[in-house]
């Protein structure tokens, strides 16, 4: 089989720009396009959440994909499918919709509010079975189904049980990428056993009364990947930084591959970006100052462009570093910076950050609604991007930032050390701290701020950062090789 005949279906709970809560959405926006450029035919399936604007993204109904029956154990539900092309590409993206499961704006989450676990389990079962039923109705048979995170983790098991003897699915291989090992989708078995056949339920990975969805996917996928070699080592090594999955990942170590993320350098390019105030390039950096000024005006901070603007873009949870930022607020307030915090999540942190911003209206701004247009302007307008995540499988924000001449200050976790070279006078283009403490964060940020005020040296580090090539080509070639090996196995 020539590689141009290879077909890959990508399944994800989020894809940018349709909906975004994490770097997974950015990954899905660019990775399938990179694989198409390597000669593969790629398509995407995801849920059609109520938050997705049909008109804005030109979604349209597909008549032959209407009223698809989704057989669950004790009932059969119907789904309909909408489709559009991934922006700036021809990649078909299919949105699976059922009013009961997806009309609400909420996305998949493994930290639902009390009482929503039953609804979440139903949503997951419906979506995973629905993907396979939609493929049959569509008549498009992929060679590989590539599942991303726990939302799609039932598909490998379904193919090896319920759909094992279906001619349409015969020979299809599965790959699974772990983007966030700490988000595992722990769901009640008593709900799933009413939705899934006994042969599936007997293979679910149980812990007491619960099912670990990510663990189940890891056990049954034909190939496993994660988003950097360092992160692969972290989650399989003796340290066991895998939140209960170290053993199964260790057992599957030979099929786990760490490949560093890339970014779409057509979408994330300051010289062509239509979402920023003024385009710029390394040889004409005055545009970056204009974006900084526009950002400060939009978020109503002091228009002092001489002070560095430090940005934080995270989910408000412990793993993404909200606790570390919260513990550093007093020291950050004492620094000569303007601080912009973007994100949402745990209400405890949102309340704390809002109170902090209210107490420092001239120098601190909080944003809990951050559409793509704002993120682009922010990345262009920040001088420094602070990345406090305790666990970062790879991250993409630091690559966006450096491409725009924004210097990252990040904790040394996962793929961070593979994408940021720590600064020294002669090389490096970012700042890394190794102790996960407010003291270490503030010290390394202080070093970056001090360098910012040395304009010549700052110009050098910005130039080195912008000279980096963070495109997908090398990583896409690695994935292409793994796909071919998988199909030959």
Swiss-Prot record:
Catalytic activity: [(1->4)-alpha-D-glucosyl](n) + ADP-alpha-D-glucose = [(1->4)-alpha-D-glucosyl](n+1) + ADP + H(+)
Protein's pathway: Glycan biosynthesis; glycogen biosynthesis
Keyword Membrane: no
Protein EC: 2.4.1.21
Biological process terms in GO annotation: glycogen biosynthetic process
Keyword Lipid metabolism listed: no
An MF annotation (GO) of this entry: alpha-1,4-glucan glucosyltransferase (UDP-glucose donor) activity
UniProt KW keywords: Glycogen biosynthesis, Glycosyltransferase, Transferase
Enzyme class: transferase
Binding residue positions for ADP-alpha-D-glucose: 20
InterPro entries: Glyco_trans_1, GS/SS, Starch_synth_cat_dom
Pfam families: Glyco_transf_5 (PF08323), Glycos_transf_1 (PF00534)
PANTHER family, sorted: ALPHA AMYLASE DOMAIN-CONTAINING PROTEIN, GRANULE-BOUND STARCH SYNTHASE 1, CHLOROPLASTIC/AMYLOPLASTIC
Family per similarity comment: Belongs to the glycosyltransferase 1 family. Bacterial/plant glycogen synthase subfamily.
Biological function: Synthesizes alpha-1,4-glucan chains using ADP-glucose.
Protein name: Glycogen synthase
Organism annotation: Chlorobium phaeovibrioides (strain DSM 265 / 1930)
């Amino acid at each position: 089989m020539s590689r141009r005949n290879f077909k890959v279906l990508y399944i994800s709970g989020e894809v940018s720009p349709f909906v975004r809560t994490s770097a997974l959405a950015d990954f899905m926006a660019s990775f399938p396009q990179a694989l198409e450029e390597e000669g593969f035919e790629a398509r995407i399936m995801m849920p059609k959440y109520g938050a997705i604007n049909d008109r804005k993204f030109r979604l349209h109904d597909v008549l032959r994909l209407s009223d698809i029956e989704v057989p669950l154990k004790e009932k059969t539900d119907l789904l309909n499918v909408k489709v559009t092309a991934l922006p700036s590409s021809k990649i078909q993206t299919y949105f699976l919709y059922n009013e009961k499961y997806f009309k609400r704006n909420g996305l998949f989450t493994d930290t639902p509010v009390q009482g929503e676990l039953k609804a979440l389990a139903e949503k997951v079962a419906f979506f995973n079975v629905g993907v396979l039923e939609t493929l049959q109705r569509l008549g498009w048979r992929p060679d590989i189904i590539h599942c991303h995170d726990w939302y799609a983790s039932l598909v490998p098991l379904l193919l090896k049980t319920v759909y094992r003897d279906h001619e349409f699915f015969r020979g299809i291989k599965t790959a699974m990428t772990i983007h966030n090992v700490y988000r595992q989708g722990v769901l009640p078995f008593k709900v799933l056993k009413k939705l899934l056949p006994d042969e599936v339920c007997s293979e679910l990975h149980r812990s007491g009364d619960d099912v670990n969805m990510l663990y189940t996917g890891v056990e049954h996928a034909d190939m496993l990947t994660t988003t950097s070699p360092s992160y692969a080592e972290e989650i399989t090594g003796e340290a066991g930084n895998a939140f209960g999955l170290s053993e199964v990942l260790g057992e599957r170590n030979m099929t786990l591959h760490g490949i560093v993320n890339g970014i779409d350098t057509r979408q994330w390019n300051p010289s062509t970006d239509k979402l920023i105030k003024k385009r710029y390039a390394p040889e004409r950096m005055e545009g970056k100052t204009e974006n900084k000024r526009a950002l400060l005006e939009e978020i109503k901070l002091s228009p002092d462009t001489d002070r560095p603007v430090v940005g934080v873009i995270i989910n408000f949870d412990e793993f993404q570093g909200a606790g570390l930022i919260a513990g550093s607020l007093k020291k950050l307030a004492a620094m000569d910076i303007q601080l912009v915090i973007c994100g949402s999540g745990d209400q405890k942190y949102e309340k704390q950050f809002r109170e902090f911003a209210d107490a420092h209206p001239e120098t601190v701004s909080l944003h809990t609604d951050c559409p793509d247009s704002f993120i682009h302007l922010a990345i262009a307008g920040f001088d420094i991007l602070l990345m406090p995540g305790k666990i970062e499988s790879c991250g993409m924000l630091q690559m966006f930032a450096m491409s725009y001449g924004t210097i990252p200050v990040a904790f040394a976790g996962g793929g961070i050390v593979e994408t940021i070279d720590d600064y020294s006078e002669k090389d490096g283009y970012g700042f890394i701290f190794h102790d996960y403490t407010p003291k270490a964060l503030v010290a390394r940020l202080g070093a970056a701020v001090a360098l910012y005020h040395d304009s010549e040296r700052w110009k050098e580090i910005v130039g080195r950062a912008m000279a980096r090539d963070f495109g997908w080509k090398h990583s896409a070639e690695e994935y292409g090789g793994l796909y071919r090996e998988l199909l030959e196995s």
